[in-house]
């Protein structure tokens, strides 16, 4: 019987070998090509600037008229661009709103994230209240937009509220509870303490007209 010549196996790492592997079917190659094509390209500087202009205009419109009362045409007009140009960056009003709310939630959570367990309780709580008041003063449109979203049932950020916001509040509530157990602050429900701070500080932005009407323009 004639002896069979030994079969030389090519390394799987070889590009030529991978192209001829049985697993590299046309369907799989097409799937890889589709996945590569679906990967978003990085935005250019001009594209990022355009998006920022649109988001700033949308913040102005949404905070003034709410989601339902706002239109793409209004946002385009405030942004100073045509409606087709705006739709190139954001095909739907919902996409603009969700993007705004996602970025807003990050900003809104930042003051609470700074509360440290190893800090002095009174200093930490006072600092948190001060930061929240500064946000109400410096970002009133964002605060009103967030309040409007809550009144609508938070359809665009409910997942972030139930995960990111809840996790952060749970963490800080535990810090407050520890301080209470150590006798450093009076005992109360830590969650309702946080809620009370939210209500007090955000009132100045969410009810700006009421505050100014009662206090007068000079004090409001």
Describe the function of each predicted region.
Residues 1-49:
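N-terminal intrinsically disordered/low-complexity leader segments
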Residues 1-3, 7-10, 186-209:
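Hydrophobic alpha-helical segments that form the core
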Residues 50-58, 75, 100-104, 108, ...:
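Generic hydrophobic, amphipathic alpha-helix propensity
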Residues 53, 61-95, 99:
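Helix-turn-helix
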Residues 106-113, 138, 155-182, 191-192, ...:
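Amphipathic alpha-helical packing segments from all-alpha helical-bundle domains
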């Amino acid at each position: 019987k004639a002896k069979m010549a030994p079969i030389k196996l090519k390394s799987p790492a070889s590009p030529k070998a991978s192209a001829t592997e049985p697993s590299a079917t046309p369907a799989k190659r097409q799937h890889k090509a589709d996945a590569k094509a679906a990967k978003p390209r990085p935005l250019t500087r001009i594209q990022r600037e355009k998006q920022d202009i649109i988001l700033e205009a949308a913040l102005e419109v949404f905070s003034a008229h709410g989601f339902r009362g706002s239109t793409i045409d209004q946002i385009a007009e405030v942004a100073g661009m045509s409606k087709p140009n705006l739709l190139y960056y954001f095909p739907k009003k919902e996409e603009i709103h969700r993007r705004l709310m996602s970025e807003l939630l990050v900003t809104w959570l930042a003051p609470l994230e700074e509360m440290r367990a190893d800090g002095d309780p009174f200093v930490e709580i006072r600092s948190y209240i001060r930061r929240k008041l500064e946000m109400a003063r410096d970002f009133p449109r964002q605060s009103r937009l967030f309040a409007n979203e809550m009144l609508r049932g938070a359809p665009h950020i409910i997942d972030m509220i139930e995960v990111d916001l809840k996790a952060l509040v749970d963490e800080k509530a535990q810090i407050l509870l520890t301080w209470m157990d150590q006798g450093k602050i009076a005992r109360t429900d830590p969650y309702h303490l946080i809620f009370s701070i939210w209500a007090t500080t955000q009132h100045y932005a969410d009810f700006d007209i009421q505050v100014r009407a009662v206090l007068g323009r000079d004090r409001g």
